[in-house]
């Protein structure tokens, strides 16, 4: 956690140039595709992104807890996004890395956005069992906050649903909550809730 905190402080103390943005967040639980990455505990997260036209690249990190010696996740990604009227298409690659003895994972993805809906597909060329599909719907008729519903499926027997409600407090701070329900062939887990506060700069 000290490594991530040092990086986050470096981001906030460094003036960002055109095309570069950053974020920090504190969350009561870190969900990834329906599963907690912190065994129900809080996480400190942060990242930095560079955008130039349709090209982008970035890095993102979070504290994690799997009950092993792995305590930090750090991801790198790059891609290209193009917008055609109401349709936007994003293709890229992302690598998930971990300290300790946990192996890194590399995925290719394509995400299509149309109006208030998006559909995405992520695949690992080394492990087809972990291929992941996701559909997300933002609810434009709700005006008091940003509300979205997400359904994801991965592997052969697991899916989850997530409802996220967020509210911008000002130009930099956003607070929100996420409610997640995960299902598999053998187990239906209870709903879990995470609260978060993020800062964008």
Map each language-model feature to its residues.
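Repetitive helical segments and hydrophobic/amphipathic motifs
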Residues: 11-12
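Outer-membrane beta-barrel proteins
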Residues: 4-6, 15-201
